[in-house]
Amino acid sequence: MALPPYDPNFTLAFSYGRRDNVFENDPEHDESASAAIVAVELISSARLALKLDSVRTEYSAQYLVDKAGSRNLRRRRKLTVKDCLNFALKKGGIPRAEDWPPLGSESKTPSSYEPALVSMKGEVIEPKDMDEVPELLVHQSAVGAKLHVFTPHIELQQDAIYLPRQVSMRATLDLEMG
């Protein structure tokens, strides 16, 4: 998926608070859309690395928002990357970007329209702790990571990296070497 042009007015979408009382800072940029973009980028990277696609292929993030997102409306929560990947695998695939309206498009496809799906199979693996991560990195073709950024702590550390107490020294060394 091609990156959008630089927008100096863009602000990151984030939420804070308990799950039943979530506050968002940017109504224009949605968490679910961001998760769908990351998911299709992971899918594209994995398919290219496994030589299932001969060139980098753009897949439809909007399809994931429309289809996987409609399942989450009943539960009233935002999509995550894991939700998007699980949906694509359960569905058996997702369409290419050109076969579905672009992300953020107001136009909707007719309910009877069924695009050709590019077949997908695999599994979403989430490690329980940092000790499982090196094993996954060796054996998996595409890896996504959730990064928590603590801006106030970075500023307090004079631009150094903040490491919470829960992170082991071994994990710190692996990150520095990797």
UniProtKB/Swiss-Prot annotation:
GO cellular component: cytoplasm; nucleus
Protein keywords: Cytoplasm, Nucleus
Source organism, top-level taxon: Eukaryota
Induction: Target of TAS1 (trans-acting siRNA precursor 1)-derived small interfering RNAs in response to temperature variations. Up-regulated by cold (at 4 degrees Celsius). Highly up-regulated in seedlings exposed to heat shock.
Localization (cell): Cytoplasm; Nucleus
Keyword Kinase: no
Tissue-by-tissue expression: Expressed in seedlings, leaves, stems, inflorescences and siliques.
Any single biological process term in GO: response to cold
Main location: cytoplasm
Gene3D superfamilies: Cysteine proteinases (3.90.70.10)
Function: Mediates both basal and acquired thermotolerance. Involved in the mechanisms necessary for quick response to heat and subsequent heritable transgenerational memory of heat acclimation (global warming) such as early flowering and attenuated immunity; this process includes epigenetic regulation as well as post-transcriptional gene silencing (PTGS).
Family: Belongs to the heat induced plant HTT protein family.
Protein name as catalogued: Protein HEAT-INDUCED TAS1 TARGET 5
